[in-house]
Curated annotation (Swiss-Prot):
It is found in: Nucleus. The gene is mug79. Its main location: nucleus. One of its GO terms (cellular component) is nuclear envelope. GO terms for biological process: ascospore-type prospore membrane formation; ascospore-type prospore-specific spindle pole body remodeling; regulation of ARF protein signal transduction; spore membrane bending pathway. Appears to have a role in sporulation. Residues 1049-1158 form the PH domain. This is Meiotically up-regulated gene 79 protein. Residues 364-384 have a biased composition (Low complexity). Keywords: Meiosis, Nucleus, Sporulation. GO terms for molecular function: guanyl-nucleotide exchange factor activity; phosphatidylinositol-3-phosphate binding. Residues 177-198, 208-227, 360-387 are annotated as: Disordered.
Amino acid sequence: MDFRITEGSSPTSLSVSEKIAKLESCNDSRITCRPVRESKPTYTSGQKHSALLSKLKRSKVTTDFCKLEESKGIICQENLHTEGAKSKTENISGEDKSSQRRTRLKQIQEFISHRRSFLNSNANSVESEKILAENNHMFNVKSKLSNKESFIKTRRPRTNGELSDLSLQPKRIFSEPVNSHPSQSMFGNGVRASSGSYSLKRDLKDYEEELPSSKKRQRTPPPIVVTNFPQEIFPSKKISLSAKRRIQGKYSGENVRARIELARERNRKRDYVSNLSKGHTTNALEENPFNLGPNYRASTRKCNRIKEAINLFAAKNGSMEVPPKVSVGDSVLTTSQKFLQVIREKTALLMNQDSNSVQPQALAAAESPTTKAPTTKAPTSEAPPKGHVKQLAKQLGNIYMPQSINNVEPTSHSSISKVVNPSEKVISKIERACLAGNGNVHPSIKMEKNLELNPHPRTLNATEHKINSRIQVSKLNTKNELANADPKMYLLENLSDRLYFCKLAKLLLRKYPLDIAEHQFALVYSRFQRIPLKQISCLKQSLVAYYSVLSEVGITNEIMLRENRFSSPKTPEGLVSISKLLLDDREHLSHDERSYIQQLQSQIKSQSVHHENAAEEIRKMRNLRNSRINSQQVGEKVFVNPDVKTMDIQETFLQDYEDETFANEGLSASKFKEEFLLISDSKSDLNSEEIATPNSLEFKNNPRIKVPRSLLTILNLHDRSQLKLFEVCHNSEFKDPINLSNCLRNLLEKQLLSYNFTDWFASLGSEYENVYVKFISHYDFSSLNVYASFQKLCCDLYYGSDDYIHSPILQVFASCWLKQNSNYGFLNEDIIVKIVLILIDLHKSTYSKKLNSYVVPMETFVKYALEKLRPLISPDSVCILSKEDKKHWLKYKKNRSTFAKLLFSTWSNLPSDIGFILECMLKEYYDTFLKSPFAVPNAVQAQLHNQVRGDLTPKRNRSSLISELMKSSKLLKQESSGNKNSTSLESDAFKESSFVLNEENGGIYAGKEIDLPEPSVIDGRPHFSVFNYTHHMQEEKTHNRLPWHRRGMISYKKMVLSKNNRWVAGYWKKKYCIVDSGKLIFYKSDHLDPNACSNVSPIHREFGLQSCLASPNLPPSINSNRNNVFYLNIPGNECYLFEAPSVLAMNEWIHSLNFNAAMITCPPLPENITNTEYGWGYILTRAEKKAYYTAADGTKTFVGDLAQLTRWSPMDIQGLQDIPRPLRDKVHILRDCVPSLLETCLLFQSLPEKMEKCFAAGSKNYLKAMDNWNRKMKFLYERSMMYKEYQRVLECEYEYRKSHDFYPTLSPVRYPYDFKGL
């Protein structure tokens, strides 16, 4: 087989710039080089139309109707195949055959032309059947089903809320590609392995001149029915096969982790509901391990009946229709875009009135569902004032969605991560409401309807009071008169039913428009209460709004309080019921809450159970949830029930709204933040009512910590409870160095400064030298040597910062040490600073981030230090040494050889006694260094632990707490009109200083890269090189979010490449697989329990993933009729096909496989230079001098034909395993090697032009050399694309960690001093 590059994708036919652009633009890992087959298709006699007839038979003729201009008769389409089967052949003469052939050709032309025109205009079915009956003698097809029945069965759409059995659902339609050859072999389970690509043109070669010259249309395969794709990725439930492949390729690697976090929970709930309806107990037990009994099943049936009623109503109103076919380029509105659209409509309606106040009539008109708001903003004659749009948005938010965040009951729940928006139409997609699974409370908790027995009567919170005061609805009485009504009167007494309708209201508002949600909620509520729908028709809007604002966590806690579960549990059954109730919502619990649940279960299951201990654990759970109910405001955005797992997604969701608001006002977001932080105020009013807290009396004895605004960037705030400890003041109050140094010391003692405090403090510059002096003067360096004194300073200031080394802090430290200690006579500040710098270099070179730490010998260290200190020692220096010091240094003189005497003898005018003292000092520091290295601040140590352990728990954004602190401190008041000029001058002065946070220096400290020592320096723990993924997964309990670990049941099929280059496929298997530590493991058991599979079940197969690549783009020779199929390419002659349950699961598997393969694959090694000739070695060098020799008879003998060529093959296809490296180092290595691989591939493409000059055309050596070139070119191209995909996956993971504080910005640097070379 001659492997060559096709003309369309040949890199040799392009220019140099086009070649580089083509190589750089290759995002997928498929090979554009395709082999060219020499075999030609063979046809039997009399079968020239066989290809055309086979195409017409395989196409869905039964589903299409065609129309001719001149119709002759009417025949039902159902008789198309039956009458064609009854047609008889007759023996005719040669003239009759030719005439019949011409008529059949004309009928074929008419049939094809009118079939093409059918897509643009729908033909009449009666006329189409008539024409098809005329052409019936051309086809000889047998079909068991009629066309109409097959059309209805295959194209029946599926409703959204259908909970029927999957066996009754329509099967997906698979259409074969056009370029498949009839001679292809079909393997089992829907996979076709093809050996070549052929088209219909070769079969119609005889009729090429007679056919019309219209453009050959490529038949579009019929669309398939997609059921499990999420709405964010696939907006329509019907999508073509080609569009599906393109979208899968587009979303296979981009923002995988963010999309997984957004849609994983919704897919899990959908699968759970479908499994319950099917009666699968295995999946049901997996999601709900507690058997809830017949009451729970009854409630599930009740939910299904309600859902069927909702679907029936939506079907009548046309809301559940299957949307039309959507192309790839169409845009779909996401939640944030819908939110922006609502804000634009309401803002445009209010701005047309050109008034600053909002009238209730206009707001009511804007909210009415019948009003059609314009999609674009109405132009206004006059520009609105600055801040007008933001003010209108606040007014809309106060009216349509009351933001009662101050007086919320202290009951939290991590499952509700709701964003309070200015419109109640939009509820965040992150809010998880389960309609069928958690709709009712556990049946063991019985509700007492008698309110007298309730020791904790329910009181309406501020949100409900606010709604009751603002929402006034009308009730239709018998005389058709409107009277005031309150939705409170329709509040259900049973708390379980109240909780159910609360979740139902939130689900309807998130899923449907406002008018449909109101009507559906009223319909379900009326059927449940058995009251006429007309009675609550006027309360539709108020009912759904009232129930949607109720807190699910508040109702649940009230259920528990009625039974006195938390205060004094009396029976073990009560504890079991509460633990089951909490575990019903275990998916939304944090890791701390899960640990409390596990402790509670262990205590309940033990024989000697202590009810008081269990009650204490439940109390901890309640306190933890209470601390998380507090709302959080980030700038203009308010978050209720902030969840650490979804905080970053919420900020991304509201980012578009914030940018749009700033754009409407003509103010950028960065400029707004700058003005928000830089408005100066000399006097702060801290005695207002808004700032006063319930325990404000305590601050009289314990005042708050005054903090300047310049320190807000380095504060380390863990939660909102620490906000009451601070009082933000103006920077002018800390002009005194003593005040600022005392503030820093106070914050350091309370561990409230972040790890980048050293960079911030060192960047102040020499202007704040007095601050450095006052800060270091707090330390006591008396009777301590230089090493011990600097080690004491390192507990607060990190020695690994580059700014710290080059700042005047070390000079101040040297002067303070000299003042507190006796001078030896020759020591000065420069010598002490140089000794400190040498010690820092010793630490960096010894404890750098390398596989094996290199310890510098003592002799090398002393010699290097003395050479650095020699220029700083004056020849006139006098050594002053006491008797105690001489006795202290005497042991170094007797036991060890001295270098100082030898070195100082070579240096003129330098006393030897000074060299002896320096040598003894350096040896003592070296011994101390081996025992106790420099200390690391606590904040840097915590950041280092997160880096080494790969801590993937998102941390709360510090800027949100700082913004709230700034807002609560009332620093943004303007001075009186008489002091405006002085205030502006003061503000301009602070803008230029380095103290103030502005747009230029705002993020300089957060992105600062500082170096860290090895973890063994701190606590003796190993680094990433010997890091155990499984141990870390068990310790952190976040294996679902780790990219290097993936486990679960998956269907797969093994494909093997045979000798004739055809893929031989096996059959589909379903096994339990684990991807971890660079390996893919298949277990023989198909059990769902991971512990049973990994501990008990034997291993079916295990292999390393080095040099492997997973991709959703199947090779051209492999076709599959299954959805969500991807393949794993293994070096050699085999690959694996995998089928995932959804697109999100497929992306998770692909990302995990490629991540493990990239981490374990060794970087590309340099090619071995051998004497073996393949066609491009020494022959090309000889051909440059003389390409051929001419004989006497004129024949030419080329140099290449005289050489003996060898078949080329790669040395090691599987590749070598790389040593364990940190993720950052792996990314840097791939960034360096990928461009070199592309350059090598580009240079190798230019060799055929030189090879043609040294070989005779068509000679044996020429064919062998070109075959070697094709083989190596394919290998280089595949390898470069593989490493390019590795680089993309690792960079995506690395940038995701950095942006979410998973992987901190602490990277190693190269040190200027390297002791290895000495």
